[in-house]
Amino acid sequence: MQKSADKSLKDRYLDLLSQQFNTKEELATEIINLESILELPKGTEHFVSDLHGEFHAFQHVLRNGSGNVRSKINDIFQDTLTRKEINEFSALVYYPEEKLKIIKNSFSSKSELNEWYITTINRLIKLITYASSKYTRTKLRKSLPKNYVFIIEELLYKSNKYNNKHSYYETLINQIIELEQSDDLIIGLSFTVQHLVVDHLHVVGDIYDRGPEPDKIMETLIDYPSVDIQWGNHDVLWIGAYAGSKVCLANLLRICARYDNLDIIEDAYGINLRPLLTLAEKHYDGKNKAFRPKNAEGLTELELEQITKIHQAIAIIQFKLEAPIIKRRPTFEMEERLVLESINYEKNEATLYGKTYPLENTCFQTIDPNGPNKLTDEESEVMDKLLLSVQQSEKLKRHMTFLMQKGTLYLPYNGNLLIHGCIPVDENGEMESMVINDVKCYGRDLLDHFEDYVREAFDHKDIQDDLATDLVWYLWTGKYSSLFGKRAMTTFERYFIKDKTAHKETKNPYYHLREDVNMCKKMLKDFGLDPEQGHIINGHTPVKEIDGEDPIKAEGKMIVIDGGFSKAYQSTTGIAGYTLLYNSFGMQLVAHQHFNSKKHVLLNGADELSIRRVVDKELQRQKIRHTNTGQDIQEKIDILKELMHDRYVN
């Protein structure tokens, strides 16, 4: 009976599919097309991570494809253009709108400008021809500016073999100039180049926090043709806040105050901070040095004091909000983080992990020593208002929804494992387990459980104290979290304890065991990937090149690409981080130098700011059939062949 039902369902599916193809020839054409696509070289994947709100640096890397645009320009024009001309042309391709204005102002006559237009349009056509050489015409057409598809295709596929259409092509370009369409065409062609040199973008976590413009990064990603995201610990903090976690909300507000980025909250997302400021002004001192923002440049003394007060107010609220979760979730094993209960308020000291420390920079004005974890009525009202404002922000809703749609905790893709943080292990390299809802979870299963609960929390934003919402916060700070990757987060100690030994956050053994090739192979196998061919691509931890640390570990099985976009870490890493390119020939790690500014590029030309290093070279050039996309296409082919056999062969 079941077999008959399955057959009936399959027949109905084939009936529906057959409606797309009116004839046998149409069906055959589609199969031929798909089979041919499988033989094309795989597209270039671009991996970035830890963007941390640094929109302009991210934009630059995106526009130049981690040096891929410059590489294509060099390939074509290195023998015909000077270094300066290549720099100028590269800058035009990266920032066409702004560079065009500068170039146009440099010409003294219209005829000179028109000559430049002709030369530049022809160069861009030549560059697109080269950059699109591994794509079908259909795919290229989708990348072209819609208003100029016909004109560009005529120029791309022109042939003067019989010398019949020379004046036709000449007239095309001359008319573009005469009708003042040159600027729009050049801008469109430049963006086409940017999209062609990278087929797919992977963001390996941490779009948010520290930097000033994560919202602009999100808008860019929403408009990007092909992208996926592996959530970072800072990303789940924002997801958690929107999903109803007040403790996640308190954490992200504290971080914004710490890095003087409260403008993100108020101006970018329209969230009203006035209730929090009123509370802070009422209870806290603006001189507390531990709560001064890390970057006070450009702030007035009044602004500095206001941020310092807000910083204290939200930090104390955060510590209070953590306690109820720790108490109702014993499987989180976080009792030592009941920090407000560890304080002897008379002696002004705290006992943590069996050791007693004197406290400094204290701001315990709203804490009742007899019930230190209880929010005051005023604090409770402030958090209610803030959460309501967060969940009513349309822009934040759009950004968080996109994060959920495009994001996962980890991603197996084209034989590689993409993961922001870690896979929790013990010192012997065995997967660490955690009990979630009476189920013992470890390895891939643990990460799957985490992700399921994140999605559940997001789907039930009105519930604030369920296991799902608590687990989103745990991903930010818990010892078995794949995103945090440390035994404890010592935020309290960093504010109030002078002894720096108390600040130490012990990393999960994963971070030194990932140097071991056998360990990495074991992890790849656990995630269903080929341990001989695959790689683990990791973000989260800045690579300290300045100290000789190598981002390529475990004989090339582990590649760490913390982007180093965060200016706060560039002094400790020595560079502006790494990105990764993976094309049909293999993988290249790109080390980036500090990005000055867009203005510097526009005025001085786009000089090379990156150094490439081969990670892995394919013995055989990779085709689309070897990729995830190829698997999807093959499944379509199999179904279409079944339809052909069912409808036309029998």
Curated annotation (Swiss-Prot):
Reaction equation(s) it catalyzes: beta-D-fructose 1,6-bisphosphate + H2O = beta-D-fructose 6-phosphate + phosphate
Keyword annotations: Carbohydrate metabolism, Hydrolase, Manganese
SUPFAM superfamilies attached to this UniProt entry: Metallo-dependent phosphatases
Keyword Oxidoreductase: no
Gene3D superfamilies named among the record's database cross-references: 3.60.21.10
Annotated pathway: Carbohydrate biosynthesis; gluconeogenesis
Keyword check for Manganese: yes
GO MF annotation list: fructose 1,6-bisphosphate 1-phosphatase activity
Documented EC number(s): 3.1.3.11
Requisite cofactors: Mn(2+)
UniProt GO BP: gluconeogenesis
Domain of life: Bacteria
Pfam families: FBPase_2
Signal peptide feature range: none
Family: Belongs to the FBPase class 3 family.
Record's protein name: Fructose-1,6-bisphosphatase class 3
Species for this entry: Staphylococcus saprophyticus subsp. saprophyticus (strain ATCC 15305 / DSM 20229 / NCIMB 8711 / NCTC 7292 / S-41)
Organism ancestry: Bacteria, Bacillati, Bacillota, Bacilli, Bacillales
